[in-house]
C-alpha cells in the first residue's frame, strides 16, 4: 500500500504529510466566524497540526467572514486578499499579530476589502504593502495599532483606486508613508488614505526614510490623483522628515480639516526633478492646522492650489519661507485663517486672495512678486474685511516693473502703508518709481467699500488703470504731501482712473492730474446715492500740463436714465478752479441732453435733462 503524501507549495515552501519542513507553508483558514489563533479550530482543517502556524508560515483567510484572534501570533506572511473580512481583534483581547517576512517578494501583508477592529499589527521593522487597488477598501478602527513598519504603502506597482481608512482612535507607526508607490512604466494613482476619528499617524524615519510621498515612481507626471485626508478633532499626522504631495505626478491632495493637525519637518506641494512633470497639486486646510518644524513649505509645478479656511499654517515657528518661485499660475486662497511665516516667494500667474477681518497674514514679503520683479499676470485680492498694512519705512512702490497684474481691495478690506519710524501712514505709488522702472497695463480695483489709503497716493507708469467702484481711495497726512497723483512724473503715460457705482470716493487734500491721464466717470443708471460726491479735495485741483493737451476728462452717461432734470456733483474742491481747469472739465464729450457746469468756481456738476416722453400707439 502506498503512503499518502499531502504537499502544499507556497513561496518555495513544502509541507509533507502535515509535518513542518524547514521551508514556509501556506495555510488557508476557511472557518467562518473562526478564531485563527485557536489550534483546535485549525485542526478541523489540518488534523495533523500540533502547533499554530508560526514565523515560517503564510496564513491566508479564505472566506468572507468575521475572524478573531484569541492570543498573540507571529507569522511569516498574512493575507485576506480577494475576500471581504472583518478581523475583530477588539472582541478577543486586542492581541498582537506580528508579520515578519522581509522586504522581498510580497512584503508580508495583503489586504483588500475588510475591516480591522482593535488589536496590534506588528510589521517587525519591514515594509508593509496593502495593495489597495481599484475597487478595494479597508477600514482600520477601534483603536487598532499598526506599528514597527519601515515603508508603509497603500498602493504599489501600478495599482490604482484603492481606499484605506484609519479611524476610531487607531494608530500607524512607520518610518515613511507612500500612498502610491507606482511604476515608471504604468500610470497609477487615485489612492485614498483617510485618517480620522482621533487617529494618529507617526512617521519617524531618518535619512532616505525621512521622505514620505503621495505618489512616488510614477510615470513621468501622468500618474496622480492621490488623496491624504486628515480630519476630525484630535486626529494628527506627525512626520519627522518631509512630506511630498505630488512627486512627478498631478492632482494630488493633502487635506487637513475639522480640528485635525499635520506637522512635518518640511512640506512640498508638487515636486519634480529635471525632465519630469508635476501639476495641479493641492493643499486644503479647512478648520485644521499645518506646521513645519525645521524647514519650509515649497510648491512646484503649474497650477498648485493652497486653500485655507478657518485654518492655521505655521512655517518653522513663523520664520520659514513659503516658496512658490517654481510654481507658475498658483492659486492661494486664505480665509479667516492665521498664516505665520517669513519670506513669500512667487512666480508669474499667482492668484492670491486673503479674506476675513480676523485673518492674520504674517509674511516678510510685501509685494508678492509685484514690486520690481518684472512679474507678468499676478493677481492679488484683499477681501471681506481683511486689513493689509505693510510696514516698510520708505514708502510702498507697487507694480514698479510688472505687466498685466492686478490688485483688488473689496468688501470692507483695507490696503494701507505704514512708516514705523514716523508712526504715520506712508506714501503708496502704483506703476513705477522712475523712468527705468515702469509698470504697464496693471489694474488696481477698489470695490464694494474696499479702501486704499496712505499719506500720498500716486498712479504712474504706462497704461495702468485705477478703478474705484463703490470704494474709497484717500490720503491722510500733512497738507504739503496730502494728495493723490493721477499720472505722476513726466515718464507716465496713458493711465486711467475710472469711478463707477453709486458711491465711488476719492478723498485727498489735493487732486493732481497729468502726463496723459484719463479721468473717467461712469454714471450708474440711477445716478449717485444721496449726498454722495465722488471727489472731494479741500486743497484744490491741479493739472500738471496746463494746456490740457495730454489729459482727458470723460463722463459716460450711457447707463444713466434720469427720471427728471437732474444735477449730479462729480467733484468738489476747496479752492477755486483756474479757467484752464474749468475748460478741461467742460471739454468732456456728452450727448445733447447733458452738460458739465462749474458751480461757485469749485464744484464740477453734471446736468441732465429728462428725455421727452412720447405716446406709444399700438394698432391691431
Task: Outline where the language-model segments fall.
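Sec-dependent, cleavable N-terminal signal peptides
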Residues: 1-26
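Solvent-exposed adhesion/ligand-recognition segments of exported proteins
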Residues: 21-95, 556-620
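Extracellular beta-strand/beta-solenoid scaffold signature
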Residues: 74, 101-108, 123-132, 148-161, ...
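Asparagine/serine/threonine-enriched low-complexity, disordered tracts
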Residues: 106, 133, 155, 180, ...
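Extracellular beta-strand/loop-rich repeat segments of large surface/secreted proteins
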Residues: 456, 465-567, 575
Amino acid at each position: 500500500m502506498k503512503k499518502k503524501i499531502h504537499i502544499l507549495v507556497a513561496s518555495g515552501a513544502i509541507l509533507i504529510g502535515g509535518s513542518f519542513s524547514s521551508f514556509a507553508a501556506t495555510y488557508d483558514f476557511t472557518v467562518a466566524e473562526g478564531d485563527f489563533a485557536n489550534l483546535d479550530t485549525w485542526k478541523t482543517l489540518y488534523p495533523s497540526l500540533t502547533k499554530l502556524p508560526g514565523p515560517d508560515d503564510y496564513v491566508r483567510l479564505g472566506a468572507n467572514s468575521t475572524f478573531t484572534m484569541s492570543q498573540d501570533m507571529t507569522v511569516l506572511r498574512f493575507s485576506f486578499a480577494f475576500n471581504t473580512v472583518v478581523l475583530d481583534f477588539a472582541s478577543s483581547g486586542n492581541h498582537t499579530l506580528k508579520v515578519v517576512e522581509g522586504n522581498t517578494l510580497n512584503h508580508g501583508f495583503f489586504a483588500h476589502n475588510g475591516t480591522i477592529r482593535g488589536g496590534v499589527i506588528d510589521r517587525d521593522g519591514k515594509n508593509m504593502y496593502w495593495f489597495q487597488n481599484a475597487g478595494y477598501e479597508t477600514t482600520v478602527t477601534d483603536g487598532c495599532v499598526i506599528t514597527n513598519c519601515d515603508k508603509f504603502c497603500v498602493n504599489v506597482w501600478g495599482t490604482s483606486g484603492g481606499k484605506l481608512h484609519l479611524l476610531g482612535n487607531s494608530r500607524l507607526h512607520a518610518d515613511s508613508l507612500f500612498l502610491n508607490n507606482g511604476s515608471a512604466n504604468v500610470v497609477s494613482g487615485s489612492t485614498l488614505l483617510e485618517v480620522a476619528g482621533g487617529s494618529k499617524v507617526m512617521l519617524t524615519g531618518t535619512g532616505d526614510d525621512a521622505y514620505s510621498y503621495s505618489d512616488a515612481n510614477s510615470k513621468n507626471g501622468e500618474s496622480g490623483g492621490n488623496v491624504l485626508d486628515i480630519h476630525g478633532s484630535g486626529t494628527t499626522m506627525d512626520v519627522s522628515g518631509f512630506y511630498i504631495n505630488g512627486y512627478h505626478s498631478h492632482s494630488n491632495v493633502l487635506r487637513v480639516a475639522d480640528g485635525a493637525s499635520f506637522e512635518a519637518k518640511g512640506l512640498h506641494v508638487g515636486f519634480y526633478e529635471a525632465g519630469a512633470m508635476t501639476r495641479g497639486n493641492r493643499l486644503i486646510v479647512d478648520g485644521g492646522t499645518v506646521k513645519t518644524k525645521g524647514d519650509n513649505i515649497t510648491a512646484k509645478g503649474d497650477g498648485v492650489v493652497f486653500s485655507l479656511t478657518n485654518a492655521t499654517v505655521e512655517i518653522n515657528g513663523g520664520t520659514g519661507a513659503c516658496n512658490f518661485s517654481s510654481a507658475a499660475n498658483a492659486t492661494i486662497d486664505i480665509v479667516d485663517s492665521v498664516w505665520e511665516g517669513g519670506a513669500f516667494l512667487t512666480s508669474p500667474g499667482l492668484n492670491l486672495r486673503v479674506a476675513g477681518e480676523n485673518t492674520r497674514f504674517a509674511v516678510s514679503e510685501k509685494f508678492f512678486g509685484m514690486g520690481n520683479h518684472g512679474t507678468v499676470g499676478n493677481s492679488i485680492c484683499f477681501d471681506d474685511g481683511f486689513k493689509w498694512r505693510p510696514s516698510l519705512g520708505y514708502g510702498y512702490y507697487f507694480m514698479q516693473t510688472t505687466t498685466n497684474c492686478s490688485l483688488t481691495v473689496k468688501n470692507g478690506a483695507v490696503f494701507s502703508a505704514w512708516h514705523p519710524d514716523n508712526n504715520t501712514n506712508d506714501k503708496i505709488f502704483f506703476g513705477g518709481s522712475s523712468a527705468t522702472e515702469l509698470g504697464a497695463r496693471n489694474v488696481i480695483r477698489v470695490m464694494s467699500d474696499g479702501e486704499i489709503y496712505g499719506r500720498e497716493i500716486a498712479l504712474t507708469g504706462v497704461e495702468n488703470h485705477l478703478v474705484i467702484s463703490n470704494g474709497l481711495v484717500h490720503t491722510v497726512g500733512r497738507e504739503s504731501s496730502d494728495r493723490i497723483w493721477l499720472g505722476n512724473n513726466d515718464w507716465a503715460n496713458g493711465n486711467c482712473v475710472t469711478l463707477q457705482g453709486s458711491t465711488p470716493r476719492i478723498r485727498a487734500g489735493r487732486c493732481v492730474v497729468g502726463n496723459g491721464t484719463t479721468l473717467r466717470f461712469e454714471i450708474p443708471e440711477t445716478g449717485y446715492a444721496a449726498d454722495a460726491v465722488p471727489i472731494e479735495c479741500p486743497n484744490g485741483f491741479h493739472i500738471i500740463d496746463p494746456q490740457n493737451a495730454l489729459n482727458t476728462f470723460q463722463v459716460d452717461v450711457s447707463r444713466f436714465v434720469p427720471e427728471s432734470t437732474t444735477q449730479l456733483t462729480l467733484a468738489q474742491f476747496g479752492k477755486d478752479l483756474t479757467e484752464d481747469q474749468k475748460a478741461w472739465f467742460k471739454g468732456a464729450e456728452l450727448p445733447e441732453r447733458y452738460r458739465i457746469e462749474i458751480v461757485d468756481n469749485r464744484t464740477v456738476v453734471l446736468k441732465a435733462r429728462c428725455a421727452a416722453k412720447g405716446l406709444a400707439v399700438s394698432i391691431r
